[in-house]
Amino acid sequence: MSGEITARLPPPLDDAVVRRFRDAMPDALRDGPRPDLLDGLAGASPYLRGLMLADPDFAAEAFVANPQSVLDRIIAGLRMVADGTCQTDFMAALRTAKAKAALLIAIADTGGRWPLAEVTAALTRFADASLQAAVDWLLREAHAAGRLV
């Protein structure tokens, strides 16, 4: 199946960007199991390239780990951070979780690890969990401030 997926990947849009990206990557990611997918994502999507550069250890994990397990862990982390954190910390944690989920789902989708139905379900699950964590945080804050009893 990997050959079929590789055949469907678009070539990187900018080889110079891909070379600079690969030079900046740690060995674990640069020499990982899917250099074709890594190059395709880095060369075609500045957003995904930026996410991989920002957290190369997570990116390396996203290429090899079970995507469902990683998504479960991201969502569980959202639930935990909504408990007792200040607004700034909660917002930062939510942005970090969004970035990780976006990268993970993109890799699972373009790498052929998830069919469209699973990609859509993962996006929906993450959106639901993010919204629930935000509502929980807001309700706790309102209660703590005496605006909600």
Language-model segments: residues:
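Non-catalytic regulatory/linker segments of enzymes
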Residues: 1-149
